[in-house]
Each structure stands twice: as structure tokens, then as C-alpha cells.
Amino acid sequence: MIVMEEIIKKAFIESINNIRRGDKEEELKKIQEKIVNAKKIVVATNNQKKFKVIRDIMLRVCNAEIKMLDIDTRFADLTRMPALTKGLIALDIEKADLYIARGRLGAPGSGSMLVILDEKGRVLTASLSPSSVIHKEDIEERIKKELIEALSRIGISI
């Protein structure tokens, strides 16, 4: 079985040689496999409502232990990419196969991002939402849509 590092190395070499022409099926399959076969997932939030939405959807995709981060991640809003920072914080303090983080995309007003990272912090998939001023949905509904979209971007249907 080909491992993620080999897939990444091959893609790097193709890019360096200017012969890369988009994603390959084996790359997509490896990402799907990592998500579906995850045994432990850490959700980078200590908000029970957000956690429940993500947990309920992910249990339809994989049979994993899904854990909520037990620290406050609001200080990530002080960084340039809060959602990604939350995921990396989770990676640094908990061992897992996948990390799911959701937060502001960038500058205040930029909207939000939900991102799924692997055990090395590589982005496997993500989705974006406009500012809440535009979409006007409650946070649980928005997170549900973001996670379903992030999964569908890599061919995992809910």
C-alpha cells in the first residue's frame, strides 16, 4: 500500500519538473482512506454545541473515538489564520489521526473556515463560509454545512 509521504513526494517531483497536471485519483483515495479509517479524531473546540454537530456527522463517516479539546481556543483569533491555528494547537497537545478545527478565516469580517488536518498537520480538506453578517444562520447549522461540504470536496457523501 502506498503511503501519504510517497504520494506527496511524487507530487512534489512532478511540480518541480513542471509536469503536474492536477490531482490524481490515488491522491484523493488516500485522503478518503485517512478520514474513513481514522480511529481517533480531536475537534479543536471546547464548545459542546459545536462539538456535537461535528461528532454526529463524523460518526456517519467513520468509527472513531471523537474527543473535544479541553482548552479554550479563542486566543487563536489573535492570529492571522485562526481556524488553522486552532487545528495546529490541537495537533500540538493531543495525539490523533485527524484534527477538525473551525474558526475565523483571517481578518475580522473574512468569514469562517472548517479544516480537517491529518496527524502531521497536513490539510486534507476544508470549506469556507461567508461572514455571518451575510449568511445569518445559526452556528450549528453553518458548521454542519461546512463539514458536509469539506467532506464532499473529497468525495465523501453524507
From Swiss-Prot:
InterPro entries in UniProt: B12-dep_deHydtase_bsu (IPR010254), HcgB (IPR012019)
Signal peptide: none
Highest taxon listed in the record's lineage: Archaea
This protein's name: Uncharacterized protein MJ0488
Biological source species: Methanocaldococcus jannaschii (strain ATCC 43067 / DSM 2661 / JAL-1 / JCM 10045 / NBRC 100440)
